[in-house]
């Protein structure tokens, strides 16, 4: 069983980097970062189930990771699910800011993925009330048949481009605000999970269930992310 789990970890997060030794400050940042991801995932009813949290460096750049597994096959994603996914992606960065009043470069991939997701919600899926049921998709067009592609000229105005950027920012800002509220409300659980990670380095599902129960933040208290009206959240 241990060999199977190690093989799965290699597939999900890459090879363990035993020569990548973090200093104490880095370990604390990574522990709170991953604890933030895991805790917010536990508190969002549409988020995938957390199966493991680790602060063991793996792969090319990962200093830690939160492993999630869907409970069922999915062929489409609802808006509520995408909003919860935004929350989980931003939770590591928000945890750093909340605890240390500082942030690190560790959230780079999270921020890129969150930005891409928010932009797709606005430009591909018609999930912006401000812009309506319109897609703004500049798909690359082949230069020659089966040849390299070139971006198509933008088919919308500069004003629309600014509106798209504004909606993307709004979605991200609102997600940040929701996550900040969740982590502040459950600060004790965040601290306990980070401490457990610093002690054990890996927290599995059983350990997480025990911690959530002991800190009065059971998984059944999960709440869905609720979108704020346009213009009410963030800057």
Residue ranges, per PLM feature:
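Soluble catalytic regions of large protease machineries
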Residues: 25-32, 38-235
């Amino acid at each position: 069983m241990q060999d199977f789990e190690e093989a799965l970890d290699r597939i999900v997060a890459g090879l363990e980097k035993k020569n990548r030794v973090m200093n104490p400050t880095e370990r604390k940042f990574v522990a709170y970062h991953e604890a933030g991801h895991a805790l917010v995932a536990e508190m969002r009813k549409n988020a995938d189930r957390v199966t493991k949290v680790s602060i063991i460096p793996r792969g090319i750049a990962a200093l830690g990771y939160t492993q999630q597994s869907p409970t069922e096959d999915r062929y489409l994603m609802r808006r509520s699910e995408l909003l919860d996914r935004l929350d989980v992606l931003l939770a590591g960065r928000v945890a750093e800011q909340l605890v240390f009043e500082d942030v690190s470069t560790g959230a780079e991939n999270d921020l890129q993925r969150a930005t891409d997701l928010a932009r797709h919600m606005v430009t591909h899926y018609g999930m912006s009330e401000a812009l309506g049921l319109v897609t703004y998709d500049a798909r690359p067009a082949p230069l020659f048949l089966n040849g390299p592609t070139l971006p198509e000229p933008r088919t919308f105005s500069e004003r629309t481009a600014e509106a798209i950027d504004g909606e993307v920012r709004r979605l991200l800002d609102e997600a940040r605000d929701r996550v900040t509220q969740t982590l502040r409300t459950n600060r004790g659980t965040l601290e306990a999970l980070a401490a457990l990670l610093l002690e054990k380095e890996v927290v599995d599902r059983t350990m997480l269930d025990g911690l959530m129960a002991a800190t009065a933040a059971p998984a059944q208290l999960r709440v869905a992310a609720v979108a704020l009206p346009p213009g009410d959240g963030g800057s």
